[in-house]
UniProtKB/Swiss-Prot annotation:
Cell compartments where the protein resides: Plastid, Chloroplast
Top-level taxonomic group: Eukaryota
Gene that encodes it: rps9
Keyword Transferase recorded: no
Keyword annotations of the record: Chloroplast, Plastid, Ribonucleoprotein, Ribosomal protein
Listed GO biological process terms: translation
GO CC annotation, single: small ribosomal subunit
Family according to the record: Belongs to the universal ribosomal protein uS9 family.
SUPFAM superfamilies in UniProt: Ribosomal protein S5 domain 2-like
Annotated Pfam families: Ribosomal_S9 (PF00380)
Protein name: Small ribosomal subunit protein uS9c
Amino acid sequence: MNTVFQKDKIGIGKRKRAVARVFLVPGTGTITINKVSGEKYLQYNTNYLNAIKAPLEKLNLTNQFDIVAIVRGGGLTGQTDSIKLGVARLLCKMEHENRLVLKPFGFLSRDARIKERKKYGLRKARKASQYSKR
């Protein structure tokens, strides 16, 4: 797969600690994540696969594009949602009318929730040792 991608044809999505760079290539609807087939990478979880394909399905473009993603960081849930956001952003970049379709479904919303840092003196971010009054 020695395809050269143009810089303006890239969609970037983030969720939790995961960052995805997404490319849409004219094709048959296959998903490739980190040079591995999407089914294998996502452990054959249909929920993850359907989530990635959802923006394309809303626009009836499922079998017209192959999704190629490079993802770093996070777990499978964060990576899946970051790819989904990247696909939606790239579809809007390709054609502005797609934004009007995808926006009501929440595909263009970045989920800003990230892990809270651990504070000193506590066991976790908020968990403290049991308080004894006497």
